[in-house]
Amino acid sequence: MALEQALLSWVHITSAAIWVGGSLLIGAVFAPILKKMSMSAEERLQLMIKVGRRFNKIAVPALIILIVTGMYQAHLVLQKSDILYDTSYGNILIIKIILVVALIVTYAVHVRIIRKDVEDQIITNQISEHQLQKLRKKIIILGEITVVLSVIILFLAALLNSGGEI
C-alpha cells in the first residue's frame, strides 16, 4: 500500500510539474522574450500559438492525470463525509476543487479562442490589427489567470499534503 501511494503521489507531482512548470515557463520566460523580438505582432502571435499547441500535447494529458489522481487521492482521504465539511482539510479541499473547476473552464476558453480557423486567419493576414490586438489581450489575460490559478492550486496541494492545517 505504501508503494502504491508513493507511485500515485509521484505521478501526481510529476504531472503538476509539467502543467505548472510549463505554464510558468511560457508566461514568465517565453512570452517576455517574444515581446522584445523584432518580429511583427502577427508573427509573434503565430509563434506563441505554435508553442502553445506543442505544449498542449503534453499539458492536457498532464492535467487529466492530475485530475484523476487528485480525485482518487481525495477519495482515499474522504472515507467519511464529515471530513469534507467539518475539518480544515476538507475546507481546503473544497476550495481546491472549486479552483480546479475554474482552471479547467479558463483553460478551455483560452484554447477555444485560438481555434484553427482563427489561427488560419492570422497566418493568412485576414484579421485586422484591431482584432489581432483584442485577441492578444484575451490570450494574455486568460494565460495569466491560468498560471495564477495553477500556482494557488499547487499551494493548496502543499497545504493538504502537510495535513490541511492552517
How would you label these PLM feature ranges?
Residues 1-166:
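Polytopic transmembrane helical bundles with strong interfacial aromatic enrichment
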